[in-house]
From Swiss-Prot:
Tree of life domain: Bacteria
KW Cell inner membrane (keyword) present: yes
Gene name of this polypeptide: yciB
Membrane-spanning segments: 7-27, 32-52, 56-76, 93-113, 126-146, 153-173
Keywords: Cell inner membrane, Cell membrane, Membrane, Transmembrane, Transmembrane helix
Major localization listed first in the record, in broad terms: membrane
Biological role stated in the UniProt entry: Plays a role in cell envelope biogenesis, maintenance of cell envelope integrity and membrane homeostasis.
Protein name, per record: Inner membrane-spanning protein YciB
Bilayer disposition of the protein: Multi-pass membrane protein
Cellular component terms per the entry's GO annotation: plasma membrane
Family: Belongs to the YciB family.
NCBIfam families in UniProt: ispZ, PRK00259.1-1
One of the Pfam families matching this protein, by short name: IspA
Length: 199
């Protein structure tokens, strides 16, 4: 079944909506209420994504599972450490998978971006390495902030720091995607060539 391409605003809403709910709930109540609201919003976003596109993006699915697990631990044990370390776990997981894939000659970032970019193998390799390093850096940054700053500061960073940093980093990769862009005709020829080799 072909995946339906969601409207950009819908995609933005499902990605940023849960974070805004988390921020608002923390501002009005406390981190534990915010955690519960965040979990509900994450599940709602995944359901909405599946209803509209018949597909849940891999990153969203992994993030949702980690949020539910660590959110539940936060609420059951009444310990905010779990929800604060959650981004570190997610960033480290993505960095590890991307970096590990490169060691075995695989570019798993292509699975996440294949509906947007057509790149040469070298392009995917460089893009994967950059994102792996970025996620590793974000994991370290999250650890530094939640361990040294107040809860409110950490929440503000999560919404107004981590998100802009990710968007800026993604935009900084545009020159790379243009440099290693693979034209559709070239891509088809490459696929055909690979098919002949396999025969």
């Amino acid at each position: 079944m072909d995946k339906k391409q969601p409207h950009p605003l819908f995609k933005l809403a499902t990605e940023l909506g849960p974070l805004l709910v988390f921020f608002a709930a923390n501002a009005k109540f406390n981190l534990f209420v915010a955690t519960a609201a965040f979990m509900v919003a994450i599940v709602a976003a995944m359901i909405a994504s599946y209803v509209v596109t018949r597909h849940i993006p891999l990153m969203a699915l992994v993030t949702g599972i980690v949020v539910i697990v660590f959110g539940t631990l936060t609420l059951v044990l009444h310990d905010e450490t779990f929800i604060k370390v959650k981004p570190t776990i997610i960033y480290s997981l993505f960095a590890g998978v991307l970096g590990g894939g490169l060691l075995f000659g695989r570019s798993f970032i292509a699975i996440m971006f294949d509906q947007v970019f057509n790149l040469t193998p070298r392009g995917w390799q460089v893009l994967t390495l950059r994102w792996a390093l970025f996620f590793f850096g974000m994991a370290i940054l999250n650890e530094l902030i939640w361990r040294t700053q107040s809860t409110d500061f950490w929440v503000n960073f999560k919404v107004f720091g981590a998100v802009p940093l990710t968007m800026i980093f993604a935009m900084m990769q545009m020159p790379l995607t243009k440099r290693y862009h693979l034209e559709p005709a070239t891509l088809e020829a490459s696929d055909a060539s690979e098919g002949d080799v396999r025969k």
